[in-house]
Design a protein with these regions (language model features):
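Secreted, periplasmic, or luminal enzymes acting at the cell surface/secretory milieu
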Residues: 1-49, 54-71, 76-116, 186-255
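Glycine/threonine-rich flexible loop motifs
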Residues: 44-47, 144-164
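Short, flexible loop segments at the rims of nucleotide/cofactor-binding pockets, characterized by
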Residues: 115-122, 158-161
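Alpha-helical scaffolding within the catalytic cores
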Residues: 125-128, 168, 186-193
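Structural alpha-helical scaffold elements that stabilize or flank donor/cofactor-binding regions
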Residues: 132-133, 198
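An anion/phosphate-binding loop that grips the pyrophosphate of nucleotide cofactors and donors
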Residues: 137
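Surface-exposed amphipathic alpha-helices with a cationic face
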Residues: 171-178
Length: 255
């Protein structure tokens, strides 16, 4: 069997549908959707460190959804494409020198020769773009991305496990102006999900994780009903971080 078909099959059977109120999903062919979140176009396919992979040529979430008949709201699509082209991810973006002491304290050679990977900063979307998109459709897909988590020194509570201020603002704006919102978690590890229940407009929730080279294609097939999601979570998602038994003891700092 072709390796891409194998990769897609694995991804299709791994993606988890956590919420689908009012039968929001699947979307019908030709439906216009407002796509939000930088990882819709800067999709995360693999982890980092020993879990890293060459992902050149892999389709993005936006590209694969369009291939399967969804219409991306054009103004938002243009905005995210422009930001990706003019603000590409650099080595500097993936290294935070303020965390060097944490890397040393973590005591692993990977952190010395590797790098701390903070979550990439979410793009701030102009209010006018959101308003104009909401006039064309009542449906939005919001992709939350986390590239951190390759090593324990990567994970932090503030602006990592919890949403960043920019993400919180984006979630609020999207849920204010769109009646039907599906959130996709393109994350290399769990994040706080307590905010999901605060917004009635969030009717769909999908755990994509880090799905491999064909993950975006698999997600698109699930969003459009070509594949029925069958994945199950391998971990328990606590309502509050403090509910995890290891919360008091887990840290990047081994000292």
């Amino acid at each position: 069997m072709d390796r891409k078909l194998i990769a897609r099959k694995i991804a299709e059977e791994s993606i988890v549908l956590l919420k689908n109120d009012s039968h929001l999903l699947p979307f019908s062919e030709g439906k216009m959707v407002a796509f939000f979140g930088r990882t819709q176009i800067g999709t995360l396919y693999s982890g980092n460190g020993s879990g890293g992979a060459n992902v050149v040529g892999c389709g993005t979430i936006l590209e694969e959804c369009e291939k399967r008949g969804l219409m991306a709201e054009p103004l938002l699509k243009g905005f995210y494409q422009y930001k990706a082209e003019t603000e590409p991810v650099t080595e500097q973006d993936e290294f935070d020198w303020t965390k060097v002491s944490e890397m040393v304290n973590s005591g692993i050679m990977y952190e010395i020769f590797g790098k701390y990977r903070p979550p990439l900063e979410e793009y701030e979307v102009l209010d006018t773009l959101i308003y104009q998109a909401a006039e064309k459709t009542d449906t939005a897909v919001l992709v939350i991305g986390r590239n951190s988590g390759g090593e324990e020194c990567d994970r932090h509570l503030t602006e990592d496990y919890y949403l960043t201020e920019t993400e919180e603002k984006l979630v609020k704006e999207v849920c204010t102006h769109f009646a039907n919102v599906a959130v996709v978690l393109n994350v290399n590890g769990l994040i706080d999900l307590s905010w999901i229940g605060k917004y009635p407009g969030i009717k769909g929730l999908i755990f994509l994780g880090i799905p491999g080279e064909e993950g975006a294609a698999a997600l698109a097939e699930i969003l459009t009903g070509q594949v029925s999601p069958s994945g199950k979570m391998a971990v328990t998602v606590a309502e509050h971080y403090e509910d995890y038994p290891s919360a008091k003891y887990f840290s990047w700092d081994k000292e």
